[in-house]
């Protein structure tokens, strides 16, 4: 009864008004699962391929009808009759059927949508919550924790139309005793920040991930204004709330000149100088996590940054590792970074995602579960964070339903777990 009887895919819209892939998986028992693939703006060059149609007369070339057809024809034919409970087999069949290193034939967006929809159908077949099923697949049944959220309240870089070079400035409500309390603290800081920006005559429009996107004189000014907002909300920076940044440094790295060009404030740095610059910010503010602090290919620079800051700051690889165990293994071996950002669609299947999380944890790295800037109402990453006891999640600000849907799912899971809901807070962050 757990066998797949039908798979149906369609083109839907993501939070940026671009098409993406949604898949439905039906089982013989009547159980059902639905999932949608997200999409990134600042992407690593080694990510699995997101298949787009390229027809400029339709959605400016961003249609996904080819990926939809791959599901409805090729993938469906290969998976009908297979047990949805064997996630590894389902994913491997799709990988083999695609036959390429980076899933370029069918697209990681097609394969991922089916992979996640299958997991949801299997959870429904077992009559368990999705996070419970994920824990079973992970080999850690019954081991759950609610993640510490990294809340992106100021957007810059590729996620906003402003002059701020660093892509994300985030708050972590480490003083909270539960996820529910952490969410409340984040929301209060978000609203306090809006008042602070308004009082300074700054824009309170939001970026792709729901954070504010004001023009500022420097990247450090973003940290300064967040400090004011934290205090205005009644919290103490460094005690109740810590800070995190996603530099997305590949986006402002000039490979020809070998420099990091912060055009918004007219400063240029070598790799080591930029790491030193980040180190000075960490001395001035309680920054406990830095993501993609250098270009994805700057491994020598990342080694310096890890040696400089890694004993006290979480050095997260996103574009650096792209949820890929082969690349992560190299980082572990060479002492590059101490944490990996986990994005389903960088690798393309749930099974490969779980493998990356396991490899990271086994090596003493942390794993931060993450959304993409182009999202949908699909909240699977909330269940992934709890079901793998990852400890941290990055899913945007405290507005836009494409972001809040993940927070709301975490609230439901916390309620479901009741007294068994574990929230470890700051101790989940590497180096803290």
Swiss-Prot record:
It comes from the Bacteria. InterPro entries: Enolase, Enolase-like_C_sf, Enolase-like_N, Enolase_C, Enolase_CS, Enolase_N. Pfam families: Enolase_C, Enolase_N. Binds a second Mg(2+) ion via substrate during catalysis. One of its GO terms (molecular function) is phosphopyruvate hydratase activity. Gene3D superfamilies: Enolase-like C-terminal domain, Enolase-like, N-terminal domain. Keywords: Cytoplasm, Glycolysis, Lyase, Magnesium, Metal-binding, Secreted. The active site is at residues 209, 343. It catalyses: (2R)-2-phosphoglycerate = phosphoenolpyruvate + H2O. One of its GO terms (cellular component) is extracellular region. Pathway: Carbohydrate degradation; glycolysis; pyruvate from D-glyceraldehyde 3-phosphate: step 4/5. It is an enzyme of class 4 (lyase). Its EC number is 4.2.1.11. It is found in: Cytoplasm; Secreted; Cell surface. The keyword Metal-binding applies. Mg(2+) binds at residues 246, 291, 318. GO terms for biological process: glycolytic process. (2R)-2-phosphoglycerate binds at residues 167, 343, 372-373, 394. Its main location: cytoplasm. Its cofactor is Mg(2+). Component of the RNA degradosome, a multiprotein complex involved in RNA processing and mRNA degradation. Belongs to the enolase family. NCBIfam families: eno. Catalyzes the reversible conversion of 2-phosphoglycerate (2-PG) into phosphoenolpyruvate (PEP). It is essential for the degradation of carbohydrates via glycolysis. This is Enolase. The lineage of its organism: Bacteria, Pseudomonadati, Pseudomonadota, Gammaproteobacteria, Alteromonadales. The gene is eno.
């Amino acid at each position: 009864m757990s066998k797949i009887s039908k798979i149906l895919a369609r083109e839907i819209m993501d939070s940026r008004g671009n098409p993406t892939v949604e898949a439905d998986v039906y089982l013989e028992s009547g159980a059902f699962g639905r999932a949608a693939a997200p999409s990134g703006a600042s992407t690593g060059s080694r990510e699995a391929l997101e298949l787009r149609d390229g027809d400029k007369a339709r959605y400016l070339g961003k249609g996904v009808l080819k990926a939809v057809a791959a599901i409805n024809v090729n993938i469906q034919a290969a998976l009908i009759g297979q047990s949805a409970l064997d996630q590894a087999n389902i994913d491997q069949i799709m990988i083999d059927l695609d036959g390429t290193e980076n899933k370029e034939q069918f697209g990681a967006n097609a394969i991922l949508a089916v992979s996640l929809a299958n997991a949801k159908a299997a959870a429904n077949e077992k009559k368990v919550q999705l996070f419970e099923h994920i824990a079973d697949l992970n080999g850690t049944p019954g081991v759950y924790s609610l993640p510490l959220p990294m809340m992106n309240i100021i957007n810059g870089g590729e996620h906003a139309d402003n002059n701020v070079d660093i892509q994300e400035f985030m708050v972590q409500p480490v003083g909270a005793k539960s996820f529910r309390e952490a969410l409340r603290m984040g929301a209060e800081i978000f609203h306090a920040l809006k008042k602070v920006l308004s009082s300074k005559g700054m824009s309170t429009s939001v970026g792709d991930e729901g954070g504010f996107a004001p023009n500022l004189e420097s990247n450090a000014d973003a940290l300064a204004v967040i400090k004011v907002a934290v205090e205005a909300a009644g919290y103490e920076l460094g005690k109740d709330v810590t800070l995190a940044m996603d530099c997305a440094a590949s986006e402002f790295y000039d490979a020809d000149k070998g420099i990091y060009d912060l055009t918004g404030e007219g400063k240029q740095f070598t790799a080591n100088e930029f790491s030193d610059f980040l180190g000075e910010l960490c001395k001035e503010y309680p920054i406990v996590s830095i993501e993609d602090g250098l270009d994805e290919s700057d491994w020598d620079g990342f080694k310096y940054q890890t040696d400089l800051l890694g004993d006290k700051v979480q050095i997260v690889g996103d574009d650096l590792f792209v949820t890929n165990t082969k690349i992560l293994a190299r980082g572990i071996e060479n002492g590059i970074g101490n944490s990996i950002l986990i994005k389903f669609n960088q690798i393309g299947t749930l099974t490969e995602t779980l493998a990356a999380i396991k490899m990271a944890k086994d090596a003493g790295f942390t794993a931060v579960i993450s959304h993409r800037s182009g999202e949908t109402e699909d909240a699977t990453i909330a269940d992934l964070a709890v079901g793998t006891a990852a400890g941290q999640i990055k899913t945007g600000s405290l507005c836009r339903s494409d972001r809040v849907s993940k927070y709301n799912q975490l609230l439901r899971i916390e309620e479901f777990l009741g007294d068994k809901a574990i929230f470890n807070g700051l101790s989940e962050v590497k180096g803290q």
